[in-house]
């Protein structure tokens, strides 16, 4: 699997062209710069990619909706809000106090963080 994963440095709009030649999942967590990078008008390759992106609405109110609108004709877009599935926690966490459990799960963010699952329509099964 490692040969199929590419992690790089600075990514330009033209770098998304590789998405046109092979199925690609873009995992994007770039602390607010997603607004500038995820623009299918500037990055044509994004039209063929599946994208999972953390959106920082706290820096730019309404950014999730703006990014979703960029992809509405070529992709399906699902919003994933922050939620804790308590049933998925390890058993040992039950031994913690409520405060310790809160501290273990808290991400120290100033506001809620939304993820968008943006799936290319021509790839949806």
Language-model regions, residue ranges each:
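Short, well-ordered coil/turn elements that cap or connect secondary structure elements
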Residues: 1-2, 21, 46, 72-74
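A short alpha/beta connector and helix-capping loop motif
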Residues: 23-24, 34-67
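Beta-strand secondary-structure signal
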Residues: 27, 52, 115-117
């Amino acid at each position: 699997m490692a040969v199929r994963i590419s992690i790089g440095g600075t990514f330009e709009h033209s770098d998304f062209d590789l998405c046109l030649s092979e199925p690609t999942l873009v995992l994007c967590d770039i602390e607010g710069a997603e607004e500038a990078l995820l623009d299918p008008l500037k990055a044509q390759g994004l039209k063929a990619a599946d994208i999972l992106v953390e959106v920082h609405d706290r820096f730019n109110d309404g950014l999730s909706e703006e990014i979703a609108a960029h992809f509405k004709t070529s992709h399906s877009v699902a919003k994933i809000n922050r939620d804790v599935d308590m049933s998925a926690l390890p058993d040992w966490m039950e031994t913690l106090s409520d405060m310790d459990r809160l501290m273990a799960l808290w991400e120290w963010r100033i506001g809620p963080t939304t993820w968008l699952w943006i799936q290319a329509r021509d790839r949806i099964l």
